[in-house]
């Protein structure tokens, strides 16, 4: 507590009045100086309070960035001063920056090592970690020379579009190869004893024969079409009106060619009989097994 300043003058004798005046003036000057010092102290206290408030706000902002677990650790170790909080925040920021840098480095290393293949030599198999699951479809040894398979029907070198005439001219020898295979399979089939193996081989022989037969029919159709087209072109050259060849005309022309071949081989009569039987079996009307109800009453 500050001492109360007494401003009243004491009554003194007249002899000592001059001395008192001097002492009183000195006392008043000291009093004024003391009041000025008191005002300055009050201003300093207010400034200190403002600084403390600013420091508290800064501490609160720093504490908002600090994790709860780290605060508990520092609470156990000692009081949370301003220096401690600054060091905490700096350490946390450094840790975050280090973590980000490590993650970026790991991602870069993974992206680089993703396509790297470890091998002792170019012909050796690929070394892979046992920690990762291996896919079923993988290439263990890379082929140096890649085989490019070409289909002549769709290859750009052979015209792009499928030309059946050209294909049959170039690869017609395959029919002879299939015929030789059928003859060889038939000879082995005759010598086999196991019934199951004989049946399997017999099915293969029949499939090869049917393949040859279908190919022959295709060749015949193509030849008939080519003949019709050639005849039509000659007729147009002579001055006749062009005529569109339909599938019906192609079938009629095929039948005529077939009859000519059968007549030449003396098989026409047999063919006609089988055809007649087939038509008659279709046209037959089957009698009902049970009589109608009206006939039973009569």
Swiss-Prot record:
GO biological process, one term: maturation of SSU-rRNA from tricistronic rRNA transcript (SSU-rRNA, 5.8S rRNA, LSU-rRNA)
Comp. bias intervals (Basic and acidic residues): 98-111
Ranges in a coiled coil: 88-112, 196-228
Keywords: Coiled coil, Nucleus, Ribosome biogenesis, rRNA processing
Pfam families xref list: RRP36
Annotated GO CC locations: 90S preribosome; nucleolus
Compartments in which it is found: Nucleus, Nucleolus
UniProt feature, compositional bias: Polar residues: 61-70, 83-92
Biased composition (Acidic residues): 14-56
Family statement: Belongs to the RRP36 family.
Protein name according to UniProt: Ribosomal RNA processing protein 36 homolog
Organism of origin: Dictyostelium discoideum (Social amoeba)
């Amino acid at each position: 507590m500050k001492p109360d300043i007494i401003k009243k003058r004491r009554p003194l004798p007249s002899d000592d009045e001059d001395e008192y005046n001097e002492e009183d003036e000195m006392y008043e000057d000291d009093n004024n100086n003391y009041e000025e010092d008191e005002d300055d102290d009050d201003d300093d206290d207010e400034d200190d309070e403002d600084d403390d408030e600013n420091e508290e706000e800064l501490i609160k902002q720093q504490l908002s960035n600090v994790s709860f677990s780290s605060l508990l650790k520092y609470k156990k170790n000692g009081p949370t001063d301003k220096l401690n909080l600054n060091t905490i925040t700096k350490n946390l920021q450094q840790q975050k920056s280090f973590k980000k840098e490590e993650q970026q480095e790991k991602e870069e290393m993974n992206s680089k090592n993703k396509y790297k293949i470890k091998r002792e030599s170019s012909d050796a198999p690929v070394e892979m970690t046992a920690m990762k699951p291996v896919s079923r479809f993988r290439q263990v040894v890379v082929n140096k020379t890649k085989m490019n398979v070409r289909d002549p029907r769709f290859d750009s070198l052979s015209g792009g579009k499928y030309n059946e005439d050209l294909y049959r001219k170039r690869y017609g020898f395959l029919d002879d190869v299939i015929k030789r295979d059928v003859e060889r399979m038939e000879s082995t089939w005759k010598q086999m004893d196991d019934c199951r193996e004989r049946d399997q081989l017999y099915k293969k022989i029949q499939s090869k024969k049917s393949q040859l037969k279908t190919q022959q029919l295709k060749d015949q159709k193509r030849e008939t079409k080519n003949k019709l087209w050639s005849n039509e072109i000659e007729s147009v050259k002579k001055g006749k009106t062009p005529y569109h060849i339909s599938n019906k005309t192609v079938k009629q022309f095929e039948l005529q060619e077939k009859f000519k071949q059968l007549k030449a081989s003396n098989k026409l009569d047999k063919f006609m009989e089988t055809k007649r039987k087939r038509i008659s079996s279709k046209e037959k009307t089957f009698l009902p097994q049970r009589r109608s109800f009206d006939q039973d009453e009569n």
